């Protein structure tokens, strides 16, 4: 079965310009493969690690998604064109192997698997361009790999997810409720979200752990891009939150704290530009840089 907990057979680096002073190092310790990258002048964008082996038995693969699944995660045959974010599972009937990266990685990590081996991509870009390490050594990620037998693939997946996340941040109680994006898609109003709260409260009657009613995009004056001020269809959001509590649900709201269109001109030094720098579908062409102290203070106080 698949095992990438060893030194890779090939390492490639992609930088903005020259990569002559860029170095990738790997270290195996405590059943983990540590991947480091350092550079003085070069601005690395991607690290590519490749492990060569032959898959000789029938194998099904399932990978994760970057943020969440929309019902599209599945077991499929080996396909080297599919990128699998964070981790993947390989099942050969009586055995399941999990390969992935520990949570809290210093990059966005994805995997590709084919019959001849496995490739891991470490996206270390900052704001869409190569990261300026200025001599620093960055821990891009920590790879782990486990093999399970005698249990179902689902049980193996749960066990492997515990391996990848040693210190999970779990809520004291289950989080559940409603989110109006999945039927309104940004076209809603104060009256409609109040009705959402009433329906959610009715469906959860008798539960001591009360549900959330989340108001998604469509409540602000400039959807998607900020500033995060209520539009005329919603009015005072604090009043709506208070009404939710009276109804018997916990108020929730959707927001992009690192997007505020007004700040693009007021504080351009706070912003990171996107590669395409386009304003399609009202999406902002920038985002606030959370490494800037003033940005963090603004988000806390806004």
What feature does the model see in each segment?
Residues 182, 250-302:
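Active-site-adjacent "subsite" loops/lids of carbohydrate-active enzymes
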Residues 196, 200, 236-240, 302:
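A general structural detector for well-ordered alpha-helical segments in enzyme core domains, enriched
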Residues 220-268:
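Acidic/aromatic-lined carbohydrate-recognition and catalytic surfaces
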């Amino acid at each position: 079965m698949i095992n990438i907990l060893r030194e890779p057979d090939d390492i490639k680096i992609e930088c903005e310009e020259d990569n002559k002073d860029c170095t990738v190092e790997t270290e195996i310790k405590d059943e983990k493969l540590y991947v480091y990258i350092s550079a003085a002048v070069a601005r690395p964008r991607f690290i590519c690690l490749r492990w060569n082996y032959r898959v000789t038995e029938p194998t099904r693969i399932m990978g994760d998604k970057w943020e969440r699944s929309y019902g599209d995660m599945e077991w499929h045959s080996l396909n080297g064109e599919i990128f699998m974010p964070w981790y993947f599972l390989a099942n050969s009937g009586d055995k399941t192997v999990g390969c992935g990266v520990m949570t809290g990685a210093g990059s966005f990590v994805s995997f590709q698997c084919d019959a001849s081996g496995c490739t891991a991509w470490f996206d270390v870009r900052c704001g869409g361009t190569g990261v300026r390490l200025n001599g620093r050594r960055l821990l891009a990620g920590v790879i782990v790999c486990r093999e399970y037998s005698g249990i179902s693939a689902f049980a193996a997946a749960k066990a492997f997810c515990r391996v990848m996340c040693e210190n999970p941040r779990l809520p004291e109680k289950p989080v559940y409720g409603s989110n109006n994006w999945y039927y309104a898609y940004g076209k809603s109003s104060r009256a409609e979200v109040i009705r959402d709260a009433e329906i959610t409260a009715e469906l959860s009657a008798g539960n001591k752990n009360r549900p959330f009613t989340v108001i998604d995009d469509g409540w602000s004056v400039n959807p998607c891009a900020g500033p995060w001020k209520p539009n005329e269809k919603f009015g005072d959001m604090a009043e709506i939150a208070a009404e939710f509590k009276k109804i018997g649900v916990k108020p929730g709201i959707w927001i992009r704290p690192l997007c505020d269109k007004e700040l693009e001109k007021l504080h351009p030094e706070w912003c990171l530009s996107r590669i395409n720098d386009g304003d399609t579908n009202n999406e902002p062409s920038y985002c606030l840089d959370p490494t800037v102290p003033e940005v963090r203070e603004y988000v806390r106080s806004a």
